[in-house]
Amino acid sequence: MRALYPGSFDPLTNGHMDLIERAVALFGQVTVAVLSNPNKKPAFSVDQRIGQIQCATRHLNGIDVVSFDGLTVHCAVTHQADLILRGLRAMSDFEYELQIAHTNRSLAEDLETVFLATSTRHSFLSSSVVKEVARFGGPVDHMVPKEVAKDLNRLFNSTFPPR
């Protein structure tokens, strides 16, 4: 079974990694789909984000990393996904994600959305929070994979020592 895990991943966090690792164990194959959204100004280019994810997931089998723009359901069909995977940190995530899941189901009736609750130790993480901490020189090595922490430190000229 193939799961499509879409997102901006700007940057990839340990919360994302937790979901990817659990999804591989549950579904066998995971396509991580990096959104190219022209309406946002990301910290990292799509190619950089793909590289970060490939580096962070190199220890896993069954991972593909692709980019997409447009509708998630089109990406899922293109990559022959059986389901769309979404992570939930809090009830506020659920309300938004449920609306999107219903919309996706209206566009592709055979495509299910599966929600995984984020592990408690990562429930506070978001890419926005990580960027904010890094922007002001705080340590992010406990929030993101090692390679991503290095990229963030370079991006924001941070010299904060690792925790």
Curated annotation (Swiss-Prot):
Pathway involvement of the protein, from the record: Cofactor biosynthesis; coenzyme A biosynthesis; CoA from (R)-pantothenate: step 4/5
Domain of life assignment: Bacteria
Requisite cofactors: Mg(2+)
GO biological process: coenzyme A biosynthetic process
Binding site for substrate: S8, K40, T72, R86
Enzyme Commission (EC) number: 2.7.7.3
A Pfam match: CTP_transf_like
Catalytic activity: (R)-4'-phosphopantetheine + ATP + H(+) = 3'-dephospho-CoA + diphosphate
Protein location: Cytoplasm
GO MF terms held by the record: ATP binding; pantetheine-phosphate adenylyltransferase activity
Record's keyword terms, sorted: ATP-binding, Coenzyme A biosynthesis, Cytoplasm, Magnesium, Nucleotide-binding, Nucleotidyltransferase, Transferase
GO cellular component: cytoplasm
TM region(s), chain numbering: none
NCBIfam families on file: coaD_prev_kdtB, cyt_tran_rel
Assembly: Homohexamer.
Role of this protein: Reversibly transfers an adenylyl group from ATP to 4'-phosphopantetheine, yielding dephospho-CoA (dPCoA) and pyrophosphate.
Family: Belongs to the bacterial CoaD family.
Protein name: Phosphopantetheine adenylyltransferase
